[in-house]
Amino acid sequence: MKIAFLYEHPTWSEKLIDCFHNNDINLQLINIDELTFDTDSFDIDFDLLINRVNVMPYEKRDSAIVFHTLHFLNWLELSGVRIINGARTHYIGSSKVVQNGIFSMLNLDTPRAIAIYKNKDALKAAEKIGFPVIIKPNIGGSGSNIARFNSSVELKLAIDQKLINLGVDGSGLVQKYIASDGYVYRVEILGDELFYSTKQKIVENKFNYCATKGCNINTRNTEQDEEFD
């Protein structure tokens, strides 16, 4: 079996690539930043693709990468190629709207949210949910373009002044703001086991709480990255 490895950030993938090489598994490396593909040709020289492209656009990154990756994954699946982290997974990972729907279907307790695609609809959605609310682009990472509004006056002013940015696909969520205990908690599960958990101090009006050392954020310090049980 020939395996291809689709990646974007070498530093995020080098340990996994090394693990394959150390186990004598050869990979065909594909850098999404350099990828073009012939849609008329189905002469694909690998049987399995591992997708490691980040689904979240953020500042200083070409947002078209998200959609170019999605087109490539769909095209490969139509061609019969097996993919780990395929088109459906990639899309779910990028869409806060779909993620919220999945949380609700699983009966997980999550803040009420209404999906919108017109800025003017944000006010009606917020009044239905109740203030305070936060507005998020459907697709986006690093806390980009997330804003909190405490009243209809604040939100109407932002709408009138065209200050709301719904991101690369022009859609988003109006979501009930839930007061916290001063920390953001991050928990990741691998299979049936806890992979890791962290908590980070909340900084007012900041929504970027990436826990990875490769993230370029100014709010990180040792106290923020405390592990918890």
Q: Each predicted region: which residue ranges?
A:
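Extreme N-terminal starter segment of soluble prokaryotic enzymes
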Residues: 1-4
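Short acidic active-site motifs
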Residues: 37-38, 121-125, 154
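Structural detector of well-ordered beta-strand residues that form the stable sheet scaffold
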Residues: 83-84, 111, 134, 173-175, ...
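ATP-grasp fold ATP-binding core
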Residues: 100-104, 126-144, 166-182
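Rossmann-like NAD(P)H-binding beta-loop-alpha module
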Residues: 106-130
